[in-house]
Every structure is written in C-alpha cells, then in structure tokens.
Amino acid sequence: MRILDTASAEYLSAHTGVASRHMVHVIGRNRETGAQEALGLWQGDDHLTIAINGANRTYYGAGGLIGVEPIRAGIGLEVRMLQATLSPLTPEVALLLRGYDTRLAPAEVHRGLLSLETGQLIAEPIRVFRGWVDEVKIKTGEVGGTSEATVTLASAARGLTRALTLTRSDTEMRRRNAGDRFRDYADIAGEVGVWWGEKRERA
C-alpha cells in the first residue's frame, strides 16, 4: 500500500478532478567521460528543479517526454515492464539516447499532482515505478514524418533474476587478496587422485 503525504491525500480525496504529469529520471554513463550522470524528463511545458527525497533534481520539459503507458501495480515478485515514449528531436533526449550508455541504467518514474487553479505541483512527486532501462528503440521518420523513441523499463524485481557474477577461482580470490592461495590448485583438483587409508599404486 502506497502511503501519501497529507497534501496529496487531500487532493485525491476531494473528487474535484485530477491533473498530473509523469517524470522520468535516468542515471546513465557518459560515453565520453565514463562518469555516471543523471537526466530527468517530464511532461511539463518548462524545465523544473524540485527536491526528491531531499536532493534536487532537474527535469526537462518542452516536449521531451511524450508519454508513459498506464502503470500496472500488483503484489509479488513478477518483473513488470513499462514503456515511455520520448521525442528524439529535443537536445536532452538526444543526449540521453546517444550521449549516455543507458544499458541497465537505474531509472525512476514519478507522478506529480498539479493544482487545478495554479497548475503548480502541490507536493513532492510520488514515485510510481523504479527499475532499470531494459531496451531503447529509436524510430526515425521519413521527411515530413514523425520520429520517436521508446524506452522500456524493467521493474526492480529484475534484480532478483541476476546470476551471481563472482566466481571462486584462484584468479578471482587473488584479485580480492593477492596473498590468498586457498584455491591455488582448484583448477586441477578433480584430476589429482586421493588415497585415504589405501596403498597408493604407482603409475
């Protein structure tokens, strides 16, 4: 069950209408510097800087984020997929898709509630999805046509399906501790005969 702040709970319970915008935040690796950099997009008309969990984030508007498909919530460990449609013609989206390596990049989707009178956010946006970038597809339109990009996100449950990458080879153990020789002969252990309480036969 999602716990809402007081302002959001009162807004939704008023039954006078709801105005909301989605926000997508991705942390990708800069292809030139190798540094991890964050980039946010939202459905608003202007750029926005807002505190999320105590840290300021900048979300770029003006058409970069076209839309997010309906989010399906549920109980369990099922990996859920979510698609966001972007406009590759905006500089921020072009940077995200071509300037960053977004393979398995951490991503979050928030939902911001807007005042019906002022059009401003009434409270800190509510996180509605968290996971990783699973796939990016770019569709380039013909002359006079429409171009768009589709980013598919996999929910955080995907982390439970990852295999353990750490091996117990001698090389891996020495990488962690150069003096660790516990598995010095691990690669030939199955080929060496062992005699327990028996007379060893000579070859």
For each predicted feature, which ranges?
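Outer membrane beta-barrel transmembrane domains
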Residues: 64-66
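Envelope-exposed proteins and targeting segments
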Residues: 80, 129, 147-149
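Polar/acidic, low-complexity leader/linker segments enriched in S/T/G and N/D
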Residues: 1-61
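Intrinsically disordered, low-complexity terminal/linker regions enriched in Pro/Ser/Gly
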Residues: 158-203
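Short, solvent-exposed secondary-structure boundary/capping segments
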Residues: 138-153
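Short amphipathic beta-strand and strand-loop transition segments with alternating hydrophobic
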Residues: 68-73, 135-141
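Short, acidic/charged, Gly/Pro-enriched secondary-structure junctions
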Residues: 3-4, 8-10, 94-134
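Extracellular/virion structural assembly segments
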Residues: 70-106, 113
